[in-house]
Amino acid sequence: MNNRILEAHLQNIGIQTYISNYSIDSFCVGDHTFTYAHGKDNYTQFKNFPLTLNDKTDLYFTQWMNENNIHGKYKYVVKGDLHRFAYTVGNTFDYISVGSLYGSSNWITANFGNTKWSINFMEIDGDDMQIGTIRE
């Protein structure tokens, strides 16, 4: 429900939105291809994707992109759920962990500590990309 409210607000100010029903999905902005995921696929994974890119995660997303015909001059994997921000450069894509807009719950506090909310954003202008953070 919250994602639909945010979508309506963003569309009211002229920002195009897309809400996916898939655990991993992708979209393009010019030559920039974004593959995005929740921190974990509850159906196929025991553990979350890591904060920073490792060999296993690099292989996982490389294979996913190949199987789903994902191409682009600039490729990014953006995932959430660890309530921290990190940017890692891989062999064929950049791997970005983004903070949680939600902040803390009892479960989050017990597992990650008392985390504050944050929003990470990317601005695309031709071949250039800038990334920023708004946080509490």
Task: Set out the residue ranges of the language-model regions.
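Short strand-coil-strand connectors
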Residues: C28-D31
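Short, surface-exposed beta-strand/loop micro-motifs that present aromatic residues
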Residues: I24-S26
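Conserved beta-sheet core of the metallophosphoesterase superfamily
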Residues: N12-I15, N21, T33-T35, K40-Q130
